[in-house]
Design a protein with these regions (language model features):
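Membrane-embedded helix-loop-helix hairpins and adjacent transmembrane boundary segments
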Residues: 1-566
Length: 566
């Protein structure tokens, strides 16, 4: 049974005290401003570039990465790092081309963008869509995976106690507003990175000790052991499997390819996942929307630079767990692939385990707080103020935002209490990507055409949203029955349940392409220049010398990584 020594508990409590104290200090320092809705929801103009970058990472790297991506590292290997490394390139695109348009047009929420560019109907529909997605997919999965992981480390049956504890910690930070979230995220990221790298270092030492019999254990030798013991786990591009191979190895290859369909994913859903997540997502863009352009750009690029190194923290422990499991060194391993990270943490010595749990908790709490604040922002600014109480003053809006945070957390706890959504069965990381992917194609099509093509109309946007959603359902449930298992658009593969399945990233790619064609066709029936289109000029996209240097460094490192692991 996993238990925590006194020193581990002291380290964990010390982390909690630091975050709570610092958050309260920030709250008290800006207490007079917190009553202003813009400050509560956006921390308008007060976050530095490094705070923006840290907050982006803290909000992004949570249980679905620590637990879910580590699980995919156990199952698939380094190929899952595509989500992190393509994100680095995506953040460059967002910083250079998306953010200038948002800031010039004073966009504070994503539904507001849709109202400004299209119409009220599109904005309202998407506000409701996002609220459901954030509460029932994101909040629930983060809370469930985090509680499962920490419960496994504590030993015993404390799952529901941990859930409530995580909720209360997130509430403590969230109720202080975006400024408190932004600056406490700096501490969260510091703990996350220090604890994450310490965990990886110790995990590699454990591999050397357990597999090679080394007394002290070397992290470098441990890493070399991972490569020699699991070479297939260090390939970025998975080979296309064969549907006729009925062996266990053949089935495993198909199951991996369904999750990450080789080179094809780079021409399909991988870009949609990243560009939609980082550029059209209130939860993420909110960190930069209250800042000046240069500050926002540097913060986003700083986050992109950090993303290059995140697979080391979130993926290598999963591969280490796979090698140990393969060699019979994880006899008590349970929980499927999502149990990989907890299995590694259980090996850590006294003291390090407390630091690792603090890092994991930091990631979970920061992400819960950020997501809850985004839910409150969308509901308060885009639904409550517009439709329920148009005369609401600043204090009333902040009060409503705090109430929304509380209610959303309670709903998330209710649905994760008995895992009503089946998150554990899907695997946490895949659960989020798959079900977010049902609306991503339509949403991203609306944004990309709305930003950069002046003829796009509100009618086309609504049609695109509906088309993207319907097509996602069609490809997931009906395409195989109508078009068969293989055609020019896709190849379906036998999954572990014995049914044919199209890789969801391929589904997303085709849903997006057809949605764009639909929107363009409808827009051609409208005016040549939509009066609601944004004015764009080349000067908006010029970057400073320091910004350009950071972009070049990031691109060089990214290229080197792909050359090494292709």
């Amino acid at each position: 049974m996993n238990t925590l020594a006194l020193s581990d508990k002291i380290i964990f409590v010390f982390y909690f005290i630091i975050v709570a104290t610092y958050g309260y200090w920030v709250y008290r320092k800006k207490k007079n401003d917190v009553s202003a809705s813009q400050d509560f929801f956006l921390a308008e103009g007060s976050l530095t570039w490094w705070a923006i970058g840290a907050s982006l990472i803290a909000s992004n790297i949570s249980a679905e990465q620590f637990i879910g991506m580590s699980g995919e590292g156990f199952f698939v290997g380094i190929a899952v790092a595509a989500y992190e490394w393509i994100a680095a390139l995506t953040l460059i695109i967002i910083a250079v081309w998306f953010i200038p348009i948002y800031l010039k047009n004073k966009i504070y929420t994503m539904p507001q963008f849709l109202k400004t560019r299209y119409n009220e109907s599109v904005s309202l529909v998407m506000a409701i869509f996002w609220l459901f997605l954030y509460v029932f997919v994101n909040l629930t999965s983060i809370l469930y995976l985090g509680a499962v992981a920490i419960n496994g480390l504590l030993g015993g049956d404390y799952l529901h106690v941990v859930m409530i504890g995580l909720m209360l910690m997130a509430l403590l930070i969230t109720l202080g507003g975006m400024k408190v979230i932004g600056y406490t995220d700096v501490i969260q990221v510091a703990v996350l990175i220090i604890g994450g790298f310490a965990t990886v270092y110790m995990a590699l030492q454990i591999v050397d000790q357990r597999i090679n019999g080394a007394l002290a254990g070397s992290a470098i030798t441990g890493f070399k052991t991972l490569i020699s013991q699991a070479p297939e786990h260090f390939k970025m591009i998975l080979p296309k499997p064969n549907n006729t191979d009925m062996s266990a190895a053949g089935q495993l290859a198909r199951d991996k390819y369904i999750v990450l369909p080789g080179i094809a994913m780079y021409f399909a859903g991988q870009w949609i996942v990243n560009l939609n997540y980082w550029g059209c997502n209130q939860y993420i863009t909110q960190r930069a929307l209250g800042a000046k352009l240069e500050t926002a750009r540097k913060g986003i690029l700083f986050a992109g630079f950090i993303k290059l190194f995140m697979p080391v923290i979130v993926m290598l422990p999963g591969i280490a767990a796979f090698v140990l499991y393969k060699n019979g060194q994880l006899p008590g391993f349970e929980g499927g692939k999502d149990g990989a990270y907890s299995a590694i943490l259980a090996f850590l010595p006294v003291g390090f385990k407390g630091l690792a749990i603090a890092a994991l908790t930091a990631a979970i709490v920061a992400s819960l707080a950020g997501k809850a604040n985004s839910i409150a922002t969308i509901f308060t600014l885009d639904i409550y103020k517009k439709y329920l109480n148009k005369l609401a003053d600043e204090k009333k809006m902040v009060w409503t935002g705090r109430l929304t945070v509380f209610v959303s957390m309670i709903v998330a706890v209710i649905f994760t209490w008995q895992d009503l959504l089946g998150i554990g069965g899907e695997g946490g990381f895949t659960f989020i990507q798959k079900y977010t992917g049902f609306i991503s194609p339509g949403v991203f099509a609306m944004f990309i055409l709305g930003l950069f093509w002046k003829r796009t109309t509100g009618t086309a946007a609504m049609a695109g949203l509906i088309t993207g959603f319907v097509l996602s359902i069609f490809f997931n449930n009906y395409a195989i029955g109508i078009f068969g298992t293989e055609n020019i658009m896709y190849t379906a593969y036998l999954n572990k349940s014995g049914a044919y399945e199209i890789p969801f990233l391929i589904n997303m790619g085709w849903s997006f392409v057809i949605t764009v064609v639909t929107m363009v066709t409808i827009s051609f029936a409208g005016p040549k220049v939509n009066p609601k289109s944004f004015e764009i000029d080349a000067s908006m996209f010029k970057v400073s010398k320091s910004t350009l240097i950071l972009i070049v460094i990031t691109l060089m490192l990214l290229s080197a990584l792909y050359v090494k692991f292709w």
